[in-house]
Regions:
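A short beta-strand-loop-beta hairpin characteristic of the jelly-roll/cupin
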Residues: 67-99, 274-306, 346
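Cysteine-cluster motifs in flexible loop/terminal segments that predominantly coordinate metals
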Residues: 160-182
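Extracellular structured ligand-interaction cores
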Residues: 61-65, 79-81, 123-126, 245, ...
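Short acidic (Asp/Glu) patches
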Residues: 48-51, 86-92, 108-112, 255-257, ...
Length: 366
């Protein structure tokens, strides 16, 4: 057993019955999988048209909705149309139609959803990234007296629809049954998209543009580093979207190499994700990766990764570099930093043998 084993988690194969989602899928469910984790996110490949969720909010935590090509080797090949609604008033939501790789920031108390995957000509990836260890949401409903009520739902408290004696394990069976019933009704001449009609009626009202600032289209980033596929994509926090609390990259590793340097983060966690490059085949991971971890930069432990994995890097834990010892097929290396600016501390040895610590960050004066 290693000292830092609790920080290294192999993502399990999640077999499920969710209609329109590739199975198995990769899902990191925060504290239910790793104590003290502060991120909860999935890697879902959407393969069919479907509708999910109702308007809801999150009380105190940002969420990010990510839509990209499912094959990260062809990140910008996005042959789909997705409708998403955002707004402060659940009866006056504004429609956003996504036709290219996009990330949406959902700040606390902003209503969002439904999500209508109304055309899927080629699989796309959908990730709901929740910046807390336990996912939760607040739903609004109007009771018989016409008064608003707000119900809480979250990981660990939802009960199984089929068997109330059991906790919901998100198998997707109830969703799939409802989705298939909805699609059958939609085929009828008079039914149409009855469930979605009120939301499309809202879209006919004048737009305020208030929520445009929360929607960011990924930009192709051409580069000359032969270790990573070009162009690549990323979301660099404040430099892309003011007040955002997320900074991460999609690095498609092409060959054996060593990247990064030994460093630590002063006050922010980091998560390092290693996954298959095609989200429809998430667990196809033909590589061997090594990384060193330790509280003391002179005494580090080496961890070897041979399957999809997430590593939690708490503040002040030294880590790196990352050595891709064998790359049989491209893999996705995703450094994930839940803050608006990225920063790290490195150690430099002076000529007299003493140590000097240097901060490097995107928030430094230009």
């Amino acid at each position: 057993m290693g000292k830092y084993d609790d920080l290294v988690f192999t993502i399990p194969k999640e077999f499920h019955d969710w209609y329109g989602f590739a199975s198995p899928r990769g899902f990191f469910r925060g504290t239910t999988m790793m104590p003290k984790a502060r991120v909860y996110m999935d890697f879902t490949a959407v393969t069919k048209e479907l509708v999910m969720e109702v308007p809801h909010t999150h009380h105190a935590v940002d969420e990010y909705l990510v839509f990209t090509g499912a094959d990260l080797n062809n990140f910008f090949e996005f042959d789909a149309e997705v409708d998403v609604w955002l707004g402060e008033d659940p009866e006056r939501l504004e429609l956003f139609t996504i036709t290219e790789p996009t990330i949406i920031r959902v700040p606390p108390k902003l209503y969002h959803c439904p999500v209508n995957f109304r055309r899927i000509s080629k699989p796309i990836m959908f990730s709901a990234v929740y910046l807390d260890g336990d996912w939760s949401k607040i739903n609004r409903r109007v009771n018989a007296e016409g008064r608003e009520e707000f119900t809480y739902d979250g990981a660990g408290i939802r009960r199984c629809v089929k068997n109330r004696a059991q906790e919901c394990v998100y198998c997707g069976q109830c969703f799939s049954e409802a989705m298939k019933e909805f699609l059958e009704k939609a085929k009828e001449e008079s039914a149409g998209d009855e469930r979605l009609l009120p939301f499309y009626e809202m879209a006919k009202l004048p737009r305020t543009g208030k929520y445009d600032k929360y929607v960011y289209t990924f930009k192709p980033e051409a580069h000359n580093n032969p270790n990573f596929l070009s162009p690549r994509a990323g979301f660099r926090g404040w430099s892309e979207m003011e007040e955002s609390r997320l900074w991460y990259l999609y690095n498609l590793v092409q060959r054996e190499c060593t990247v990064g340097e030994l460093h630590m983060h002063h006050a922010v966690e980091e998560y390092l994700f290693f996954t298959g490059a095609d989200i429809t085949d998430f667990f196809n991971f033909d590589a061997e990766v090594e990384i060193q971890l330790g509280e003391d930069p002179d005494h580090l432990e080496t961890y070897t990764i041979t399957e999809p994995t997430v590593i939690r890097i708490p503040p002040k834990l030294w880590h790196g570099p990352v050595t891709f010892k064998r790359v049989g097929a491209p893999i996705n290396f995703m450094p994930f930093y839940p803050a608006g600016n990225y920063g790290r501390v490195i150690r430099q040895t002076q000529t007299d043998g003493s140590s000097h610590y240097l901060y490097k960050g995107t928030d430094l004066p230009k």
